[in-house]
Amino acid sequence: MATDKGLEDVPEGQIESNYDETVDSFDDMNLKSELLRGIYAYGFERPSAIQQRAIMPVIKGHDVIAQAQSGTGKTATFSISVLQKIDPTVKSCQALILAPTRELAQQIQKVVIAIGDFMNIECHACIGGTSVRDDMKALQDGPQVIVGTPGRVHDMIQRRILKTDQMKMFVLDEADEMLSRGFTEQIYDIFQLLPQSTQVVLLSATMPQDVLEVTTKFMRDPVRILVKKDELTLEGIKQFYIAVEKEDWKLDTLSDLYETVTITQAVIFCNTRRKVDWLTDKLQARDFTVSAMHGDMDQTQRDLIMKEFRSGSSRVLIATDLLARGIDVQQVSLVINYDLPANRENYIHRIGRGGRFGRKGVAINFVTADDVRMMREIEQFYSTQIEEMPMNVADLI
């Protein structure tokens, strides 16, 4: 596959767009009528910035690199493109979508199924932590779209259970995250096992060297689309901080907040799994109802907790960054960073949840003396202001 040297001279891990056409209505994209029906039924009215720019080149068959964060509508961008390109009458895998976490893969699967509701297609999630036998059975039925995590997908292709001969499109979502989690080898292997003619679509919030290497090795003359940070979703989200002198005082601060704020639904982020468990125990001991979720839990447990949270029967979810990218709960109006994220890129993944697509939200950051520098960095990185939390914060939620 051809290399694209132009990508290597990019400043600060940001790609340069080389494609600027926009289509600002779904009706003007020449989509199948059943697909269009699914898009509107899903609740979309007009395309977001990335959808206006990226859907058309993908549908036209170009390899596409899109740099965009969560909350920009990127999942629907490639879901719509995939659904437009596949042939529902052919019962075999025509599109493969890889994601870094099981939660994200399942979320993508839900979007594909919902938007493709009138199209008579099958979409199967091929993820670790589930029964291999069930996977094999589902794959033998020939679902047109597979969404999965690299380990399990690689395994199924190697066992020749997932057949790739009809593959038209390969989508890598959150490529930076997948490569930083050590999936590089499996991803390279999967590329080698796909037909030469497979179209490649890569989405990534950042463009570190390892992502650029994938694009140069496996993509042909790609269309590059950068959705700049100012089009992203900190807009509409009120961001505050509470100065907490010592780490030990955070728990009391959180308990006081619980009293003040009768929260609709909230996610509280901690930086480690142990901290999540510790905080959950402490809050439950104080008779607060909270649920917790992190990567040490098995899949069944995680699914159950997400289900309870989505349905509203559990109100407060304590989680690690692993889940910042997999939680898409429309009614979350409050995010609390009990710990500031260890890297600034994760800040938008955490709080971009609360205000997606113009929904309002509030983010409250607990900031110790040691965190002040990181908070300033976050403000600078996102060109945003995080202000001290006012007394009447309850009125804002």
From Swiss-Prot:
GO terms for biological process: cytoplasmic translational initiation. Keywords: ATP-binding, Cytoplasm, Helicase, Hydrolase, Initiation factor, Nucleotide-binding, Protein biosynthesis, RNA-binding. Pfam families: DEAD, Helicase_C. ATP binds at A68, Q69, S70, G71, T72, G73, K74, T75. A motif (DEAD box) lies at residues 173-176. ATP-dependent RNA helicase which is a subunit of the eIF4F complex involved in cap recognition and is required for mRNA binding to ribosome. In the current model of translation initiation, eIF4A unwinds RNA secondary structures in the 5'-UTR of mRNAs which is necessary to allow efficient binding of the small ribosomal subunit, and subsequent scanning for the initiator codon. Belongs to the DEAD box helicase family. eIF4A subfamily. This is ATP-dependent RNA helicase eIF4A. It comes from Chaetomium globosum (strain ATCC 6205 / CBS 148.51 / DSM 1962 / NBRC 6347 / NRRL 1970). The gene is TIF1.
